[in-house]
Amino acid sequence: MNRRLSIFVIILFFLLPVAARAQVTGSFRFAQLTDIHLNPNNPKPTEDLKRSVEQINATPGIDFVLVTGDLTEEGDRTTMLVVKSILDQLKVKYYVIPGNHETKW
C-alpha cells in the first residue's frame, strides 16, 4: 500500500507543473440550432431554419454553430440534403451532432 501511495505522489509531483501551466487561450462564441424537424409536408420549419441562418450570419463575433440533433422529422436523405443546403449558407463553420430522428431511432 505504501508503494502505491509513493508512486501516486511521484506521478502527482510531475503532473502538477503541467496543470499549473494550463491557461485559457481566449474565449469563443457559438450559436446552437436544435430540433429543427424539417418536414417536406410543412414549410414552417424550413422558413424558421432559413431565418435562423440569416440571423446568425448577421450577428458579429460568432465563431461556429452547433447543430444538436433532430434536423429532420423522418431522417430521410432528401430532407437532410435540404437542411445541408441551408446550413451551407452559414458564414462560419458548423458541426452537426445527429439526433434520434437522424439515426432512425
Regions found by a protein language model. Give the residues of each.
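Bacterial N-terminal signal peptides that target proteins for export
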Residues: 1-8
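Bacterial N-terminal signal peptides
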Residues: 8-17
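N-terminal active-site segment of His-dependent metallophosphoesterases
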Residues: 18-82
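Extended active-site neighborhood of metal-dependent phosphoesterases/phosphodiesterases
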Residues: 77-105
